[in-house]
Amino acid sequence: MFLTSVLILCSLAALSLGQKNNNFAPGRNTIVHLFEWHWDDIANECENFLGPKGFAGVQISPPAENTVIGDRPWWERYQPISYALNTRSGDESALASMIRRCNNAGVRIYVDAVFNHMSATSGIGTGGSSCDVEPSASPAVPYGSGDFHGRCTSNNYQDPNNIRNCWLSGLPDLDQSKDYVRDKILEYLNHLVDLGVAGFRVDAAKHMWPADLQVIYGRVKDLNTDHGFSQGSRPFFYQEVIDLGGEGVSKNEYTGFGTVLEFKYGTELGNAFQGNNALHNLENWGPAWGLLEGTDAVVFIDNHDNQRTGSGAILTYKNPRPYKMAIGFMLAHPYGTTRIMSSFSFDYNDQGPPTQGPGFNSVRNLHQWVGGANTGWRQILRVMVGFRNAVDGTSISNWWSDGNQQIAFGRGDKGFVAFTLAGDINGNLQTSLPAGSYCDIVSGKLENGSCTGKTVNVDGNGQAYITLSSGEDDGFLAIHVGAKV
């Protein structure tokens, strides 16, 4: 009996640990969220840019059918009406094709999975299904009123029962303790695993009981080996648990069976790179700041929600210089699994994605997309994703600061970065890099053996002469062994 119990516990521990494995292909380290992109466009991006440039994965918008709402706001994607795979991003056939093409390009797909709730808006869905909020009925699943928690408003963030059993923003709250509800959620998740996805961002995980989620995750299938995953590989789960401290639900409740989106990360870096906290304080960046252990955390500067509704601490594409610097720091630092944002420009918070033409099946307007077709953003994202890949497996070394708003650090003998928010850096800094000339990948690129930007010389003692002006557009430089002149 004792041996059986031990074996069961070991099996559960292995299962939970596997759900923290991001399933990246070797040599790749960063997820990009292609928010509201069409499936066909994502497939092309995987083949033509993300795969060749070393990106590890794509987080896609919710693929489940949602209610069609008024002016088609972005948030209608978070109002599921069924688990049919039919949205304005494309149908199931297009989704399946995209997943296969991206996997073939070495880029994994992570689904934004919404199963805390169903739609708060009665009406017709993107695939023609219907729902009625008043009796809490989603006949296309089907769910009936008995599958939901009783109506109450989620408004007391000191009370875990209120947070997890009441309706968030009027959204009918599913009861994940019920076997039937679990089974319907599992049908949805397992179908996506069959199609070849590598994992899930779990929307509103904070509003579901950890014990229920642990059961659901544990019953999701192993990943599909037809898509290049090793036998027995588990889906990667990263959970939306907004925890900035002082509430009744803690992010630590969710780390036993998956990773967690670390919201404190972007808030603190946003403050730092806007000059509200001196950069030199980042020397001990990580759990000492109240962050999760790095193996438990998926980190980001901004997301689709707080781009629009976040505090002044949140950096977005609308604050280009500090935003790029914060992204650069995130991708240069070894902490956490990194995720970057590719969104669209917007003038008001509810604004949906751009198109050319009268319907959402028309070709998207590339000029309104940020981090995709916009070549300036592609440059920063591409080179720093490449930097992270080049320095993988190394730790922080040779930390330097001026005691205020200038910092620099190495990644072992593989790379080195420097940042300034105030004043110029002109002088020798210690690195662990081999002697030679290196191309600053932020100001230029290595092309036919020459650097189109700054060249940084490292002597035989590892000393690098760094010149970085506080007036430069990007505010930082980066060199690594893969960009040696």
Curated annotation (Swiss-Prot):
Cellular component annotations (GO), alphabetically ordered: extracellular region
Pfam families membership: Alpha-amylase, Alpha-amylase_C
UniProt keywords, alphabetically: Calcium, Carbohydrate metabolism, Chloride, Digestion, Disulfide bond, Glycoprotein, Glycosidase, Hydrolase, Metal-binding, Pyrrolidone carboxylic acid, Secreted, Signal
Active site: 203 (nucleophile), 240 (proton donor)
Record-annotated site: Transition state stabilizer: 305
Enzyme Commission number(s): 3.2.1.1
Modified sites of kind Pyrrolidone carboxylic acid: 19
Signal peptide segment: 1-18
Expression (tissue specificity): Expressed in larval and adult gut.
InterPro entries given in the database record: A-amylase/branching_C, A-amylase_C, Alpha_amylase, Glyco_hydro_13_cat_dom, Glyco_hydro_b, Glycoside_hydrolase_SF
Gene Ontology terms for molecular function: alpha-amylase activity; metal ion binding
Subunit-level organization: Monomer.
Entry protein name: Alpha-amylase
Organism listed in the record: Phaedon cochleariae
